[in-house]
A protein has these predicted regions:
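Non-globular, low-confidence helical/coil segments that flank catalytic cores
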Residues: 2-301, 321, 327, 332, ...
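N-terminal carbohydrate-binding accessory modules
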Residues: 301-309
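Short aromatic-glycine-(Arg/Gly/Cys) micro-motifs in beta-strand/loop hairpins
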Residues: 308-324
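Short, solvent-exposed mixed-charge patches
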Residues: 349-350
Length: 350
């Protein structure tokens, strides 16, 4: 039997390429590891109109953002109360003061193994102090790339964004997915809708986005937390970090409506104080500081999206670009519209 070497080589190359493609697709979808120990604790610290979260797993600690400059003593004292002696990682999601503000004070007090930020330079005195105290620890700021991973005890931290360079500082926000056993937490900083969409496009088919607890983006501004992101993430709980009666009008009614439509239980630091989530690897239990307040337990609302039969674009029911009645088709969910081959409207659905 004569063997065609060219066809044989071509066949082998096809198999190799297919195998590589499978690896790229599956490398963020590995089997869930079994976990043991005291679990993962995530504390969304009440720092007013700002962000700050402390994560603890197997005696290791990670701080994501540090509130405003005026929150420095509050954050340092909170870490002291939690028994922090050393930080495995400090993450500055992006360079705005309401995220980096308290981090210089933290780095001045606590030995830290790694510092992450989306940039090493930014035109502000508080960011300069952040860089200074990082240098004082003998560290360099690490700018993580999409897909980078590190461990916090038995918890796995994966960097999912940003996936491009952006001029808008909010869009440079580092996005982290923290998994512990079968549970997961998502932190999106202040990333806005266009960058969210870029990230979802980048990871399409490669990431299981399902999340137990979503730290709602940009203090629940209408610039973030799009229908598309919520459809992918499908969170059980949404934590909003914001200040009472803040000047920005947060939380905005539009993302609150989207969260309610998705059936997300909403927990707000301006109402509940510091919020604590504890995962045992199977389930997440939430408690909060202000015991007299209760979270907003949303029931999935009746969702209707309007599709344009001609353009194959679907819209939120309050969109200004709705089709005529004879050219309209209704969908009961975002996913139903996507499955029918329709694309989301760029204006109302981001």
């Amino acid at each position: 039997m004569k063997i065609d070497k060219k066809k044989l080589i071509a066949g082998i190359l096809t198999l190799v390429i297919a195998a590589c493609s499978y690896v790229v697709t599956e490398y963020l979808r590995e089997d869930t590891p079994a976990v043991s120990g005291d679990g993962l604790t995530v504390q969304y610290i009440d720092v007013g109109q700002a962000d700050c979260a402390l994560l603890q797993c197997d005696g290791q600690f990670m701080l994501i953002d540090g509130g405003n400059r005026d929150d420095s003593q509050l954050v340092v004292s909170f870490l002291e109360q939690q028994g922090v002696k050393e930080l495995t990682a400090v993450v500055c999601s992006h360079a705005h003061e309401d995220h980096v503000g308290g981090l210089p004070a933290v780095l001045a007090v606590y030995p830290t193994k790694a510092v992450y930020a989306p940039t090493k330079t930014y035109s502000s005195s508080i960011f300069d102090k952040f860089v200074y105290y990082t240098d004082q620890q003998g560290l360099e700021i690490t700018i993580p790339a999409p897909g980078d991973r590190f461990s916090l005890g038995q918890a796995e931290v994966t960097v999912l964004g940003p996936v491009k360079s952006y001029a808008e500082t909010n869009d440079t926000s580092i996005v982290l997915r923290v998994t512990y056993g079968e549970t997961s937490f998502l932190f999106t900083g202040d990333m806005e809708t266009d960058a969210e969409n870029d990230m979802l496009d980048y990871w399409e088919g490669k990431v299981d986005w399902k999340t137990d607890v979503l730290k709602v983006g940009h203090h629940c501004s209408n610039s973030s937390t799009s229908y598309r992101l919520l459809n992918e993430v499908n969170p059980t709980y949404g934590v909003i970090s914001l200040g009472k009666d803040n000047s920005y009008g947060h939380p905005h009614k539009e993302p609150m409506s989207r969260l309610n439509q998705a059936g997300v239980t909403i927990l707000r630091t301006d109402e509940l104080g510091t919020i604590q989530a504890v995962s045992d690897g199977k389930e997440v239990t939430l408690t909060w500081q202000n015991q007299s307040a209760v979270p907003e337990n949303a029931e999935p609302a009746a969702q209707v999206f309007i599709g344009n039969k001609n353009s194959k674009v679907f819209h939120a029911p309050d969109c200004k670009n709705l089709p005529s009645e004879k050219n309209a088709v209704e969908f009961a969910s975002y996913q139903e519209a996507v499955d029918a081959g329709y694309s989301p409207c760029g204006s109302c659905l981001g």
